[in-house]
């Protein structure tokens, strides 16, 4: 199963995350199938590849709870249903 989840990177105690599509059994920081965005919790900066995320969701990818929350705030699910 394909999951949309966060991949951690950055310095110790200054984490940032990439939103990636990955096989659910792979490691958190393992090689993803595709990088779809960026999230920095310290500054609340979010950059998304909206077309790529919508494509993956339509193919059946399941977002984790945290990624689902980020996508909801960015109104991605509204764009799918429109």
UniProtKB/Swiss-Prot annotation:
It holds the Pfam family Ribosomal_S16. GO terms for biological process: translation. GO terms for molecular function: structural constituent of ribosome. Keywords: Ribonucleoprotein, Ribosomal protein. One of its GO terms (cellular component) is small ribosomal subunit. PROSITE patterns: RIBOSOMAL_S16. Belongs to the bacterial ribosomal protein bS16 family. HAMAP family: Ribosomal_bS16. NCBIfam families: S16. This is Small ribosomal subunit protein bS16.
């Amino acid at each position: 199963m394909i999951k949309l989840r966060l991949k951690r990177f950055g310095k110790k105690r200054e984490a940032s995350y990439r939103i990636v599509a990955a096989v659910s059994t792979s490691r958190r920081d393992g090689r993803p199938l595709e990088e779809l965005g960026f999230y920095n919790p310290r500054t609340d900066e979010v950059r998304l590849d909206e077309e790529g995320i919508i494509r993956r969701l339509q193919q059946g990818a399941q977002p984790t709870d945290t990624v689902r929350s980020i996508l909801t705030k960015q109104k991605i699910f509204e764009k799918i249903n429109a």
